[in-house]
Design a protein with these regions (language model features):
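ATP-binding glycine-rich loop module of kinase domains
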Residues: 146-175
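Active-site activation/catalytic loop segments of kinase-like enzymes and analogous catalytic loops
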Residues: 344-403, 420-435
């Protein structure tokens, strides 16, 4: 391109010289890019070329005008001819399009997307991202609390969800994909359209259906009784089709590793973080005007002997691992449902972890916190707009009633401790990826831990 520019300027200098106005290449640069660049007054008497031969002035005018006329004439060509010309001259290989790779539905989604994929820390993945998503339009970002990205996309054939991740997160997503394939004959799960694992990247596409919505939305747009019935069906199906057929005895070594990694490891990360270290120095916190014991004041809850005794009685088997409200998908046109986004690598694979995840939603209000944009911290005070619906309260009461009827009190206490540990496991991710709101999720951990402590000390018999 630059050689063509220089060739054009050199030819113009030679032509003007022949036409009676001696010009060097440097003079052409001065004419085109100097103070009076593209000033046609230069052709008039008194201008830079006002005294030049008429042929030189007409030549310069033609040099400017003829390309403009050619571009205008190209717009008059038949559409088929113009399309063929565009295809022949495009820079990208035929069939490859990068025009619609930003989320189209929401401006905030576009900003987050650009920050995530074109920040310096992600530049190694940009090429793979472009190759993976050629020929599709990204409509909306549905990513939640993980390092994988979920986008609503469309191509020339259909609309679908695409989930993908790179590096270690890609390996984790590949484990999720293996779980979905292994359990597809046992459980109602999302339909996988296609997938690929290569070069440190994993992705898969899921069927999109406008009548399928997350249970959070379903719960707040339908009678609570319908959501209660679906949730009971989900738990009964998991019990009969997954937990019981895969049941094995509890493994003391895995319980020990679970405590060491998921409890001690995450507590250590909290104590080492500068912002949380200051918050954790107080004996109590005032969260939205209510006083709670701070986490260090509840350290007896994380005593190893206590946890070993609690978890030794846990049932063990294959589990979903991330049974939050948003991972239960409900159909609005009938009473069916299916599950998405399992989580592997929990070490202590107990159904009680699934129940704990469900309580992280219904008791801890995780989904409402995810929709809360900001938090204020001053000394030992943490304030944010915590919204909670009557529908959540009703569903929590139903779940606690079912758990209390099915399990003795000590096992319900174990389920509640797994909820606390889920909040504990969430914190390093929030400190790394969502630091501005991390104090709010720490407050969620503290509030849940206080409720569970009261239950363990028999100060209350239920959470609601």
């Amino acid at each position: 391109m630059w050689a063509a520019y220089l060739g054009s300027y050199t030819a113009l200098a030679a032509a003007l010289t022949v036409a009676g106005e001696p010009m060097r290449l440097v003079d052409v640069f001065g004419l085109l890019f100097g103070r009076n660049a593209a000033d046609f007054a230069a052709l008039l008497p008194g201008g830079a070329l006002g005294t030049a031969a008429p042929a030189a002035r007409w030549l310069l005018l033609a040099w400017f005008v003829l390309p403009l006329l050619a571009m205008w004439a190209a717009t008059l060509l038949p559409e088929g001819v113009r399309g063929a010309m565009n295809q022949a001259t495009q820079a990208a290989p035929a069939g490859e399009s990068y025009l619609n790779l930003l989320p189209q539905a929401d401006e905030h989604d576009r900003a987050v997307f650009l920050s995530r994929y074109f920040g310096l820390e992600n530049k190694d993945y940009v090429k793979r991202f472009l190759q993976m998503n050629r020929g599709i339009t990204i409509l909306e970002d549905y990513s939640a609390g993980s390092n994988a990205t979920t986008m609503l996309c469309m191509d020339t054939q259909s609309t679908f969800y695409r989930k993908y991740a790179f590096g270690k997160d890609g390996a984790k997503l590949a484990e999720q994909l293996d779980w979905l394939r292994a359990q597809q004959d046992r459980l109602p799960l999302c339909d996988i359209l296609r997938s690929e694992e290569a070069d440190g990247c994993c992705w898969y596409d899921m069927v999109y259906n406008p009548q399928a919505v997350g249970m959070f939305r379903y719960l707040h747009s339908n009678p609570v009784e319908k959501s209660r019935a679906i949730l009971r069906a989900v738990l009964a199906t998991l019990e009969d089709k997954l937990y019981k057929p895969t049941a094995v005895p509890a493994d003391a070594e895995k319980i020990e590793k679970y405590i060491e990694t998921k409890v001690d490891g995450n507590l250590k990360k909290l104590h080492e973080d500068r912002m949380l270290r200051e918050l954790m120095s107080y004996d109590t916190l005032r969260i939205n005007g209510v006083e709670y014991k701070n986490l260090p004041a509840l350290d007896w809850m994380f005593d190893h002997d206590r946890l070993r005794n609690l978890f030794a009685k846990d049932p063990v088997g294959t589990i979903h691992g991330d049974l939050t409200i948003e991972n239960i998908i409900c159909r609005t046109d009938n009473d069916s449902w299916y599950l998405i986004d399992p989580n592997t690598g929990n070490l202590h694979e107990s159904p009680f972890l699934d129940y704990g995840k469900l309580l992280q939603s219904l008791h801890g209000s995780y989904e409402f916190m995810m929709k809360t944009p900001r938090v204020a911290v001053q000394d030992n005070r943490i304030d944010f707009q915590l919204t909670r619906s009557a529908a959540y309260d009703a569903l929590l009461a139903a779940v606690m009633e079912d758990l209390s009827a099915r399990y003795p009190r000590e096992q319900v206490e174990s389920i509640l401790m797994h909820e606390v540990i889920h909040w504990l496991r969430l914190m390093p991710y929030k400190l790394n990826k969502d630091r501005k709101r991390a104090a709010m999720f720490y407050a969620g951990l503290v509030m849940v831990a206080n409720d569970v402590a009261d239950f363990s000390e028999h100060k209350k018999e239920t959470l609601c």
